[in-house]
Amino acid sequence: MKKTKDIGICAIDIYFPQTYVNQSELKKYDKVSNGKYTIGLGQTNMSFVGDREDIVSMAMTSVKMMMSKYSIDYQSIGRLEVGTETIIDKSKSVKSSIMSLFQEYGNTSLEGVDTLNACYGGTNALFNSLQWIESSYWDGRYALVVTGDIAVYSKGAARPTGGAGVVTMLIGPNATLIFDQSLRGTHMENVNDFYKPDLSSEYPYVDGKLSIECYLRALDKCYLEYKKKFESINDDNKFSMDSFDYVCFHSPYNRLVQKSYARLIYNDFLQNPNNPKYQDLLPFKDLSTGKDSYINSKLDQITLKLSLDDFKTKVNPSTLLSKECGNSYCGSVYSGILSLLSNVNDLNNKKVLVFSYGSGLAASLFSFRINNNKNRNNNNNNNNCFFKTTNDIGKISNIKERLSNRVKVSPEEFTRILDIREKSHQMVGARTPIDTLDYISAGTFYLEKIDEKLIRHYKSKPIISSKL
């Protein structure tokens, strides 16, 4: 196979549930201080599901939606890889269940399985797919990356940081979002900031303060790794946030995204402390990126103020889905990319920096550039001529209208549904979900039953066509 170029994301879409709870209403129900969820966390609404939907049904819906909206031939997919930490079977992969969609069209030749590492699995699945297309093993077909989760927490302070959603990406040559080859900063270490050792429960064990410190430390490390590679390739250019038009972050909650961009500005200062625009940060020069810098409120205050204008233009356009749907774990940073494409019209030639983080921990800083030129030379490969502009992708995904058509559920009903979901997850044996199908939209897969062999059976809610 002839070596290809301009590899990246050709299309991207997301499935999120029809139901959501409003964070202001949840705050009142939880009897916490005003603004704790909306200002303290920076969240607006939160998606959730009952016992009728699981990671398999959501992933299947996301894939089928992508294939249908873009009229993609199922035979044109040669790799399908899933990134998720929502585990419903200790052996059977989510990818194997998605195969039922491809078997229907006679395609059983698809490489890839599931990748697991907290919220980082989708990024690893993406990297694997990019490298597959770059390799001698590539057979000329597209890759499909499916990534997302159902994030649920027990009652308490962490519950409003939940969410749900699954992103699907079509990866191939001659892409619209072209990844920068050789530019990637990665940091990994062994730490117990967030983990799920109790397989009878969906709820994680979380050390909130440690997790924030780990996130920011990983960001610091990835910044330095990326900077080193960037400057080795671009001899005359120094790496800084000025090198990019937009930045997307993994978003447990939006306030952490704000702090993270401010942290990158602080890293810029440490690399160039004599720049006059950073004069307010000079007292922190010797603090560097040590542990004390993660809990220094004065430093936070100054960096947030310094970075605010840039945050509004460079980062805020990518936060729509995370603020509206909450944390989709593996899908979070990619929902940020889709939000950006949906919010900004003129993205041609723009450069985007992306930070992906998964607890435990694994993190990467990487980048892509956008090419909306429909007249590009496309003789690179036989049938890989699929091309959509970022405006096309935004219109096809139609996330703003879809968000507005969701069903708002009261905090009382939200709590009741999650209680049912918790009890259902702990049950072993044949059972039929009891949650209503009224909240399942047409064309969505749902869990019909679990039989006596504990095999899960899914159905798609019929699409009823109206006739005159």
Swiss-Prot record:
<keyword id="KW-1207">Sterol metabolism</keyword>
<dbReference type="InterPro" id="IPR013746">
    <property type="entry name" value="HMG_CoA_synt_C_dom"/>
</dbReference>
<feature type="binding site">
    <location>
        <position position="259"/>
    </location>
    <ligand>
        <name>(3S)-3-hydroxy-3-methylglutaryl-CoA</name>
    </ligand>
</feature>
<feature type="active site" description="Acyl-thioester intermediate">
    <location>
        <position position="119"/>
    </location>
</feature>
<feature type="active site" description="Proton donor/acceptor">
    <location>
        <position position="250"/>
    </location>
</feature>
<dbReference type="Pfam" id="PF01154">
    <property type="entry name" value="HMG_CoA_synt_N"/>
</dbReference>
<protein>
    <recommendedName>
        <fullName>Hydroxymethylglutaryl-CoA synthase B</fullName>
        <ecNumber>2.3.3.10</ecNumber>
    </recommendedName>
</protein>
<keyword id="KW-0756">Sterol biosynthesis</keyword>
<dbReference type="InterPro" id="IPR013528">
    <property type="entry name" value="HMG_CoA_synth_N"/>
</dbReference>
<keyword id="KW-0752">Steroid biosynthesis</keyword>
<feature type="binding site">
    <location>
        <position position="327"/>
    </location>
    <ligand>
        <name>(3S)-3-hydroxy-3-methylglutaryl-CoA</name>
    </ligand>
</feature>
<dbReference type="InterPro" id="IPR016039">
    <property type="entry name" value="Thiolase-like"/>
</dbReference>
<dbReference type="GO" id="GO:0044351">
    <property type="term" value="P:macropinocytosis"/>
</dbReference>
<keyword id="KW-0753">Steroid metabolism</keyword>
<dbReference type="InterPro" id="IPR010122">
    <property type="entry name" value="HMG_CoA_synthase_euk"/>
</dbReference>
<keyword id="KW-0808">Transferase</keyword>
<comment type="function">
    <text>Condenses acetyl-CoA with acetoacetyl-CoA to form HMG-CoA, which is the substrate for HMG-CoA reductase.</text>
</comment>
<feature type="binding site">
    <location>
        <position position="250"/>
    </location>
    <ligand>
        <name>(3S)-3-hydroxy-3-methylglutaryl-CoA</name>
    </ligand>
</feature>
<comment type="pathway">
    <text>Metabolic intermediate biosynthesis; (R)-mevalonate biosynthesis; (R)-mevalonate from acetyl-CoA: step 2/3.</text>
</comment>
<keyword id="KW-0443">Lipid metabolism</keyword>
<dbReference type="GO" id="GO:0006084">
    <property type="term" value="P:acetyl-CoA metabolic process"/>
</dbReference>
<feature type="binding site">
    <location>
        <position position="161"/>
    </location>
    <ligand>
        <name>(3S)-3-hydroxy-3-methylglutaryl-CoA</name>
    </ligand>
</feature>
<dbReference type="GO" id="GO:0016126">
    <property type="term" value="P:sterol biosynthetic process"/>
</dbReference>
<dbReference type="Pfam" id="PF08540">
    <property type="entry name" value="HMG_CoA_synt_C"/>
</dbReference>
<keyword id="KW-0444">Lipid biosynthesis</keyword>
<dbReference type="GO" id="GO:0010142">
    <property type="term" value="P:farnesyl diphosphate biosynthetic process, mevalonate pathway"/>
</dbReference>
<feature type="binding site">
    <location>
        <position position="119"/>
    </location>
    <ligand>
        <name>(3S)-3-hydroxy-3-methylglutaryl-CoA</name>
    </ligand>
</feature>
<dbReference type="GO" id="GO:0004421">
    <property type="term" value="F:hydroxymethylglutaryl-CoA synthase activity"/>
</dbReference>
<feature type="active site" description="Proton donor/acceptor">
    <location>
        <position position="85"/>
    </location>
</feature>
<comment type="similarity">
    <text>Belongs to the thiolase-like superfamily. HMG-CoA synthase family.</text>
</comment>
<feature type="binding site">
    <location>
        <position position="359"/>
    </location>
    <ligand>
        <name>(3S)-3-hydroxy-3-methylglutaryl-CoA</name>
    </ligand>
</feature>
<feature type="binding site">
    <location>
        <position position="211"/>
    </location>
    <ligand>
        <name>(3S)-3-hydroxy-3-methylglutaryl-CoA</name>
    </ligand>
</feature>
